[in-house]
């Protein structure tokens, strides 16, 4: 396999996008630590910005540098709730979601309940003064405050009911309230300035109560849908971990994907709040699962898979290979970690960006179409989140992949030692000088000092405080009956007596601070530092710091452990044996030294502690019979499942193949012939043995690469196709292509399906020939056919019994079941149905003395030439025909029509009859059938009956008419070898892979038609070469090879 990765040939836009992505990824991967730190710090700063605006106080109105700003009356209505009372509600309070602006003539019956929260020990003495000062102002009336409405014992509350139309004037009037003492006054605090370092707990408690309230009043269907959405989201996350585990990472890559997504969401939320786009927390709670389900984690998985594929191609599964014609320096440059990431981006970057653009475009369209709805706001947030996620994928996550590959390279044998010997200062593909390290240390220390200086600087908070205060999330709505129960009760009594419908808007309590001669008393109770420091003092801030500390410790430990991997070679040899999954396979012919006695290795194997067993020790266990050769895959899979290292099932199977090769090479009875198998040119790496295990082959020691060509294109039933052919016979594909060209000149080939039914013929034994004859009569009767068909059809959705053919030989009875099998070739399907049908025959037909000699009595007849298949057909019965113009026969086939007709009669008809041929009235149909069978994963043995073919030619109006009739074509598009990746790709080439979505069996029938058309092309070209006398010359020119050489 050529390890050189070739770049695609993209179009203009794709080329420019890929080039830009290469530059971005290359820069990020060559400075991984910088990229990780900048991303983490940016996300942390944005996270604190969101917390600052949402939960905590910036107190910009209380700071000595604050500017006087006009009162934003509308902001005090955030979180308010309106209730109504009247005859329509049977004089009971109910939540009223209508607009708060009343209709004309009803303003007197729309009240606002305002609670003033006044701090300070002297407030009790000032309450009479305040009541007299504020009562009657703009129609305000004092009501009895609700008990426990104050947040702390040293706070007092005053409640007023104000006509809603006078609310603006009332709030402006109470912005500053004088105290009974001349030096004291209360100043109104903006809703955005509420809170303290303890407000996060209050916010969480309020959010929990609000959540319970919404759950209590929500519809059951809504709760079920939301629950299912979160369940599906969690399943998506679990699927991410499973896929990453399959790719070789148990935890860290999947966790990095989730961390990158969390960073993207935090940054997107920060941008959204900065743009003054309100974010509805309820819609956010409901919408995030659908965003995760819609977008998923396919793009990070796609990039990860591409990176691993490129690294595998360049490093050759642990052995660095130098491609032919490339110098060692070029190879070394191609194998640098950043270059690997860039090559992966060349392959998949454009497709990932295209997917991102489509998703972002759809979300942006939703934001534009619904700019004032919560759905539009969520689309705005989701679009920004996806855009930032795309940026982080090619920077932050690409850097994580770079670190992962670097650790893998360091831990691989010879990785760090060889690199250090030639490039002692190369890290992440970037040459690092000692002076650069010194500068990096100085910058780190200087940045640390600068951060602390900014934390203590008022200028920092003056700038950042004004910026952070703009991004807030809407608060939780107030509970009217909890905050203003007494006021609502008084209004209720008045409205009930007067009989007027009344609406009341309950505002959240207005927070005040007590100032004395310009000194903020409340401010002295706060922490010394505002801004970011408050965020760090909050419980969530502490949790984030602890999480960052844990991640830092784990990452440093991982990197230090990787660096130590090669520091102590002897310790590494004991910790990572030669048989580990990252090691280079051992040589079977090299002298081996067993480090442990056989008894110890056997004990480890029996006690399920075989993780430390090396390849050589496992080979010795195989040779001593402690591990059966056929069960190596199961044994290695069990060892991998209990391993502490991340070992995939595919890696376990590949290791099993490697060990089996070594065991076969060392088997004493065959060592004189098989000793070179382990180091032979038979390949075994880079193959998906998971598909082979339990399905296609046992005792696997590798795979055979078979040359694959395509003939055509050929027009078959109006559709042009390339026909894949796997063969080692020269001229075959070229000859078929010439036949395709000639057939296309006449309009292409036409095919017909004459029959579709697979057969199985069991052999039954009876006590006497008379009982066998009675059984035959019962099977051929309508009752017998009905019983057998019912039992047979119940075994499969696709198997449907068509006909029963019965033959008797003495006491033996042969029944040939013919049935449809869908898109499968169907031998297993029909065997299961025959077994059940015979059970029904013995039980319901009255033949308990019947004995099944064999399920296949050669009356099928399977994998052998038989007249019953030639006459009655088996599998698909297909005919393909074409008409070739006389001019094409002369120009392309280099012969004439009459010569071809005569040759076909003399050779294919008379000659085959003289030889007593059975189904062999053709030139070389088996050649074409077998080549297509091997290419598409069909059963090679069934080439025997599938190649039964008669070729006919006739001169019609001077043109050549040619046809092939093949009564027993046995093919399928599911099961067997069609599950292998390469063979499945060839079925994709023909458009017939898998089961047909709407018409069962259509893909298999189409494949049979294609094989018959390929035989038609091969027959035409070969007969023409024979007629023109070119066959020998063609084979001498194209089918001659030099003697085989053995690579040393």
UniProtKB/Swiss-Prot annotation:
NADP(+) binds at residues 796-798, 823-831, 1039-1040. It catalyses: (R)-mevalonate + 2 NADP(+) + CoA = (3S)-3-hydroxy-3-methylglutaryl-CoA + 2 NADPH + 2 H(+). Disulfide bonds: none annotated. The keyword Glycoprotein applies. CoA binds at residues 735-741, 892-894, 1034-1035. GO terms for molecular function: hydroxymethylglutaryl-CoA reductase (NADPH) activity. The active site is at 729 (charge relay system), 863 (charge relay system), 939 (charge relay system), 1035 (proton donor). GO terms for biological process: coenzyme A metabolic process; ergosterol biosynthetic process; isoprenoid biosynthetic process. GO terms for cellular component: endoplasmic reticulum membrane; peroxisomal membrane. CDD domains: HMG-CoA_reductase_classI. PROSITE patterns: HMG_COA_REDUCTASE_1 (PS00066), HMG_COA_REDUCTASE_2 (PS00318), HMG_COA_REDUCTASE_3 (PS01192), HMG_COA_REDUCTASE_4 (PS50065), SSD (PS50156). It is found in: Endoplasmic reticulum membrane. Pathway: Metabolic intermediate biosynthesis; (R)-mevalonate biosynthesis; (R)-mevalonate from acetyl-CoA: step 3/3. Its EC number is 1.1.1.34. It is a multi-pass membrane protein. The keyword Glycoprotein applies. Residues 1-32, 242-250, 298-348, 399-439, 564-1048 are cytoplasmic. Keywords: Endoplasmic reticulum, Glycoprotein, Lipid biosynthesis, Lipid metabolism, Membrane, NADP, Oxidoreductase, Steroid biosynthesis, Steroid metabolism, Sterol biosynthesis, Sterol metabolism, Transmembrane, Transmembrane helix. Residues 54-220, 272-276, 370-377, 461-542 are lumenal. Residues 222-403 form the SSD domain. Glycans are attached at residues 470, 520. The chain crosses the membrane at residues 33-53, 221-241, 251-271, 277-297, 349-369, 378-398, 440-460, 543-563. HMG-CoA reductase; part of the first module of ergosterol biosynthesis pathway that includes the early steps of the pathway, conserved across all eukaryotes, and which results in the formation of mevalonate from acetyl-coenzyme A (acetyl-CoA). In this module, the cytosolic acetyl-CoA acetyltransferase catalyzes the formation of acetoacetyl-CoA. The hydroxymethylglutaryl-CoA synthase then condenses acetyl-CoA with acetoacetyl-CoA to form HMG-CoA. The rate-limiting step of the early module is the reduction to mevalonate by the 3-hydroxy-3-methylglutaryl-coenzyme A (HMG-CoA) reductase. This is 3-hydroxy-3-methylglutaryl-coenzyme A reductase. It comes from Aspergillus terreus. The lineage of its organism: Eukaryota, Fungi, Dikarya, Ascomycota, Pezizomycotina.
